[in-house]
Amino acid sequence: MSLGSLAFTLFLTVVAGIKCNGTEVCAGSPGIPGTPGNHGLPGRDGRDGIKGDPGPPGPMGPPGGMPGLPGRDGLPGAPGAPGEHGDKGEPGERGLPGFPAYLDEELQTASYEIKHQILQTMGVLSLQGSMLSVGDKVFSTNGQSVNFDTIREMCTRAGGHIAAPRNPEENEAIASITKKYNTYPYLGVIEGQTPGDFHYLDGASVNYTNWYPGEPRGRGKEKCVEMYTDGKWNDKGCLQYRLAICEF
């Protein structure tokens, strides 16, 4: 069918569906609904409404967390200015009366006599070879032979220390007692952690030595020091029995 014939057929179909009344007003049948149009542009905002009444109170919220720990103390402040001098105190109580002058003289006399007796005793002991005085030191022995720790304890109990010569004069005094008893004594000198490093019992470094040639050679195994009768030193173990000589 040609395009013109198709158009004519559709025209007849439409005309056939039209009804006319006596006044020449024709009413056609409803056509097929068209496709929906596109959405229009948004309208303008309306005016604000009237303010509403306040709402009811809300429920109580949960309690907050626990209190935190106290903070650290702050730094000390600067020292304050010195205060004013206080008032003078009341006089103290009267002291005890002093000794009469004659008693003071008697005390001086007694002190002199005691010193004289001590010097006499020291002289007797020196003649016996059991005690010698050199400078401000006194070297003494009781003639016993014991190990190093026992000698140290004996001397400490007597208020002294194991004899430790710090110069040739003191070394000779100890050697004199050694010859008298013909027994080697221990000296107040010991070896430290480092082999060959010797020091006095108070920790001070040794400032005087009189080693026998080739000594010390214990190399850390002989911690104590003994003296020969000629005054020479030798490193030795500390468990031997040696003459106890103390210094005061």
UniProtKB/Swiss-Prot annotation:
Residues 69-82 have a biased composition (Low complexity). GO terms for cellular component: collagen trimer; collagen-containing extracellular matrix; extracellular region. Residues 28-100 form the Collagen-like domain. Belongs to the SFTPA family. The gene is Sftpa1. Residues 54-65 have a biased composition (Pro residues). One of its GO terms (molecular function) is carbohydrate binding. Gene3D superfamilies: Mannose-Binding Protein A, subunit A (3.10.100.10). The modification 4-hydroxyproline is found at P30, P33, P36, P42, P54, P57, P63, P67, P70, P76. The keyword Signal applies. Residues 42-51, 84-93 have a biased composition (Basic and acidic residues). Disulfide bonds join C155-C246, C224-C238. SMART domains: CLECT. This is Pulmonary surfactant-associated protein A. Keywords: Calcium, Collagen, Disulfide bond, Extracellular matrix, Gaseous exchange, Glycoprotein, Hydroxylation, Lectin, Metal-binding, Repeat, Secreted, Signal, Surface film.
